[in-house]
């Protein structure tokens, strides 16, 4: 198996090293793992693509490239340049430093990389490691993803139907904020929503007198609906959410039919 990996935390992020190990084990002795990851931090860029400027790509080592762009840019560079003569069988994005469950999904560059791969017609999985008191205190906060990542990806690939239909399918995997041995299992999950304040701004004044704002995130440990991603993560489960690049509110099509003329 040939696997392309990317992330949004950057080429030197520890989560990318975890993902490389996961991908290496998945690819097997006869497989290949290729890395095309952002040269700089790209967290929160979503599905951004840099079509208004050129993108510099530098080779950092064997099958290892850094691109001055977003995770989606990196996937495009991997598919249409770096690996153009022999495309990958699978694209993995992550392992993100922090969860991409609930509304975080909508901002995530990690998700953006997987979504772009799906739009390009490839199997794609985003992987993220929830942070919390129970895994922040251990030597490797990525322990849960490192220990269970191979099994989760193998299960997803084994159970994905040959024909997925409609808009391209991809997966969002979030590992719980617990040590690896305390993971309770794997659960299919819906995308949750954390009620209350999400992102906001915090004003500051520079010594020069100029005013600026920091973007602040909300409480990541607020519960979400039963059976949804963040709730299951906080209970100790790995969540697997199948997703599509389709933002249509299908449940509103019939109630809004009166709009038609």
Swiss-Prot record:
Keywords: Cytoplasm, Hydrolase, Metal-binding, Nucleotide-binding. Its EC number is 3.1.3.5. Gene3D superfamilies: Survival protein SurE-like phosphatase/nucleotidase. Its cofactor is a divalent metal cation. It is found in: Cytoplasm. The keyword Cytoplasm applies. Its main location: cytoplasm. It is an enzyme of class 3 (hydrolase). The keyword Nucleotide-binding applies. One of its GO terms (molecular function) is metal ion binding. A divalent metal cation binds at residues 8-9, 43, 96. Nucleotidase that shows phosphatase activity on nucleoside 5'-monophosphates. Belongs to the SurE nucleotidase family. This is 5'-nucleotidase SurE. It comes from Roseobacter denitrificans (strain ATCC 33942 / OCh 114) (Erythrobacter sp. (strain OCh 114)). The gene is surE.
């Amino acid at each position: 198996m040939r696997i392309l990996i990317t992330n949004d935390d950057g080429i030197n992020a520890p989560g990318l090293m975890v993902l490389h190990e996961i991908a290496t084990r998945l690819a097997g002795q006869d497989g290949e793992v290729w890395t095309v990851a952002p040269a700089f931090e790209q967290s929160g860029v979503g599905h951004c693509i840099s079509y208004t400027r050129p993108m510099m790509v530098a080779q950092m080592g064997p099958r290892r490239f850094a691109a001055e762009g977003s995770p989606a840019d990196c996937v495009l560079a991997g598919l249409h340049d770096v690996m153009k003569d022999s495309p990958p069988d699978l694209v993995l994005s992550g392992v993100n430093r922090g969860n991409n469950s609930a509304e975080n999904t909508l901002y995530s560059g990690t998700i953006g990389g997987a979504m772009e791969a799906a739009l390009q017609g490839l199997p794609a999985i985003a992987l993220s490691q929830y942070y919390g008191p129970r895994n922040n205190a251990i030597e490797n906060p990525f322990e849960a993803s490192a220990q269970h990542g191979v099994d989760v990806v193998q299960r997803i690939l084994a159970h994905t139907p040959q024909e997925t239909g409609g808009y391209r399918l991809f997966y969002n995997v979030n590992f719980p904020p617990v040590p690896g041995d305390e993971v309770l299992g794997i659960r299919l999950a819906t995308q949750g929503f954390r009620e209350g304040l999400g992102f906001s701004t915090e004003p500051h004044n520079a010594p020069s007198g100029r005013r600026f704002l920091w973007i602040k995130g909300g409480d990541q440990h607020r519960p979400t609906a039963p059976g949804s991603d963040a709730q299951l993560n906080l209970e100790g489960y790995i969540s697997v959410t199948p997703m599509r690049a389709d933002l249509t509110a299908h449940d509103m099509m019939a109630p809004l039919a009166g709009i038609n003329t």
